[in-house]
């Protein structure tokens, strides 16, 4: 969605086409022109030669984008290791976001972000909020892993919490402003959402080979390398209700001492004083030792797996699977 928005703000919407073939050709050429702004890899150069796409002049009329709503935008493109995505981006074709700024043509943008995903490759790509004088950008952290926030699991009551919040941001406050939803469907989002719903494991099964690194909200919101500055993270009420309710074990280490509570509707209650928040944050620092050792165990798992796979080539195996020595 964010790439599409960047493309539309650059190339506009081409409506003066003769037929579908003309529309397809212009779309390819405009996209090639959009990509020309960045350093391109060898594959994209060959593609442009084969399709005979030449850079088009930047259009003079570009539409505003009224609203962008995204769920846990991440910089993951199939590759389980970040370095592979960087290599692909540099040598083959640019796929990573070039910067963290929201285009001025976008009037409002909302981003629902996962608190609990533990895969380093799935680190969130935040919008930079420095220099923003209004609430044009609203980025809120929700309980659950990547697909618990964005949806995708069959047990989805937790993801409906983020969906309910996002829909609320787009609803019409008065007649002829905002979106109007089918009432029965809209009511289902509210009634079936549950901030005590089941949370999934982002690294279960083969996903355990994704690099282990729980999200650190403070670091993510103050990332100079990514050009992101967010003074006070917004935490959705559901995360704090989930902790307070104790209906299930939930004690995220990522929530900082200084944050703002956001509710889907109405005002959020106060869950802790500033002094209590600071004390909680300091107490949870002890969990950082466990995170450190779990990261060490991840690399031990990776090395042992590589050793097991490579043993097929330097050890002598009998047909029944018994190792009889070096090859």
Kindly label every feature range from the protein language model.
Residues 1-327:
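Active-site- or binding-pocket-proximal scaffold segments within functional domains
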């Amino acid at each position: 969605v964010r790439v599409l928005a960047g493309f539309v703000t650059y190339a506009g919407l081409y409506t003066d086409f003769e037929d579908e073939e003309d529309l397809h050709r212009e779309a390819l050429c405009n996209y090639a022109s959009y990509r020309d702004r960045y350093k391109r890899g060898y594959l994209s150069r060959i593609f442009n030669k084969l399709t005979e796409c030449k850079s088009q002049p930047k259009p003079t009329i570009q539409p505003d984008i009224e609203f962008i709503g995204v769920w846990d935008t991440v910089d993951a493109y199939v590759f389980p290791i970040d370095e592979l995505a960087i290599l692909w981006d540099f040598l083959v074709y640019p796929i990573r976001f070039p910067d963290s700024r929201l285009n001025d043509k976008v009037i409002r943008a909302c981003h629902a972000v996962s608190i609990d995903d533990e895969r380093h490759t799935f680190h969130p790509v935040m919008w930079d909020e420095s220099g923003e004088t209004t609430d044009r950008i609203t980025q809120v952290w929700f309980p659950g892993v990547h697909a618990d926030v964005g949806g995708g699991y069959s047990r989805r009551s937790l993801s409906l919490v983020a969906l309910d919040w996002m829909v609320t941001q787009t609803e019409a406050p008065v007649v002829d402003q905002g979106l109007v939803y089918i009432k029965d469907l809209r009511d289902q989002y509210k009634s079936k959402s549950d901030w005590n719903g089941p949370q999934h494991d982002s690294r279960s099964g083969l996903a355990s080979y994704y690099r282990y690194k729980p999200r650190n909200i403070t670091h993510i919101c103050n990332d100079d390398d990514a050009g992101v500055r967010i003074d006070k993270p917004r935490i959705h009420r559901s995360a704090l209700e989930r902790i307070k309710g104790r209906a299930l074990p939930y004690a995220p280490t990522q929530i900082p001492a200084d944050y703002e509570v956001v509710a889907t509707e109405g005002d959020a209650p106060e869950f802790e004083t500033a002094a209590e928040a600071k004390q909680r944050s300091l107490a949870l620092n002890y969990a950082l030792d466990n995170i450190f050792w779990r990261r060490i165990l991840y690399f031990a798992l990776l090395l042992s797996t590589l050793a097991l796979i490579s043993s097929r080539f330097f050890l002598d195996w009998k047909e029944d699977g018994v190792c009889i020595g070096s090859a």
